[in-house]
Amino acid sequence: MSIASSLTSATLCGASVFPKALACSSEFPINLPSPFESSKICLTSFPASRDLKKNATLNLTRNVGPVRCHAMQAGTRELKKFELSDVIEGKQFDREMLSAIFDVAREMEKIEKSSSQSEILKGYLMATLFYEPSTRTRLSFESAMKRLGGEVLTTENAREFSSAAKGETLEDTIRTVEGYSDIIVMRHFESGAARKAAATANIPVINAGDGPGEHPTQALLDVYTIQSEIGKLDGISVALVGDLANGRTVRSLAYLLAKFKDVKIYFVSPEIVKMKDDIKDYLTSSGVEWEESSDLMEVASKCDVVYQTRIQRERFGERLDLYEAARGKYIVDKDLLGVMQKKAIIMHPLPRLDEITADVDADPRAAYFRQAKNGLFIRMALLKLLLVGW
């Protein structure tokens, strides 16, 4: 377990800053910079019975000699290690862990700029390796790290502008990058690449999407959004719509929804991009009721959540005929809003093309931009937990 001081930095006579205390139970000297080079500062705790405040006061005992610092918040707290070393797939999480992560995410929502909490990752470096395009995932991770006081190492397009373009193996890239950073966030075009990276690295690895495999942090923010918007996770009905064969977000989301009671999942997709059997088998073995349907209007009228996804052109290769056949079959528009429940929500991992019409955006049930914002808080929580613990 690591130890975190509850005492924030203070200023001596408005000039010199002394370091954070490692303990408040005894005196210890601290060397001061000019103009107090010949002095030392000693830390003494007040009796535990005294009311404590989150600051420190400095008393000059005389013009020369030691300066005594009285810490008005005594003691230390232990940070419990996070149960996971890496975040690779949805099946890693249980219900209790999800609840605890969401509690931390809610704390992240309240962090103010320039507060002590906004510096909890100061001194840490995050490396982002994105071999596929990203807007929300990459920027929200980088924003999360910086909002907690950390720094970011990045390459614009790891597939083209890293040594992968020269033929370097993923394992060699990971071994190199871990020497420069404290945590790696990686998106890759191959399913299973994140697991390979985690097996190679001696620092935490977060899967930011591995081809058609999984996207666990997206699923975390999705479930967090459902809980925030609907108010519950047990007893809900969710429609997963669109490209269910290639969409990694729906795969990870299905794994997480299976942790809750009395959940029903509807799969609505063109025949060529149906949900794969491994997810269906997992849901069945977990006791989750699921159903395939071709009628989005009927399903939407029953559901608390309509989770729309785009048909992924990049997964079809040269088969543009198959892509065009699948694209545009299921659209969320004003007509669909007309049959949806008043308290239901529409979600989308984004980016969208034409599968949600723009006139839906103004409806309060359109939750996808609120969903994207929640990604910041979930990723702040994960970075904090993986690097410093609970």
UniProtKB/Swiss-Prot annotation:
Its main location: plastid. It is an enzyme of class 2 (transferase). GO terms for biological process: 'de novo' pyrimidine nucleobase biosynthetic process; 'de novo' UMP biosynthetic process; amino acid metabolic process; cellular response to phosphate starvation. GO terms for molecular function: amino acid binding; aspartate carbamoyltransferase activity. Pathway: Pyrimidine metabolism; UMP biosynthesis via de novo pathway; (S)-dihydroorotate from bicarbonate: step 2/3. Feedback inhibited by UMP. Carbamoyl phosphate binds at R136, T137, R187, H215, Q218, L350, P351. It catalyses: carbamoyl phosphate + L-aspartate = N-carbamoyl-L-aspartate + phosphate + H(+). Its EC number is 2.1.3.2. Coiled coil: none annotated. Keywords: Allosteric enzyme, Chloroplast, Plastid, Pyrimidine biosynthesis, Transferase, Transit peptide. Residues 1-68 form a transit peptide. Homotrimer. This is Aspartate carbamoyltransferase, chloroplastic.
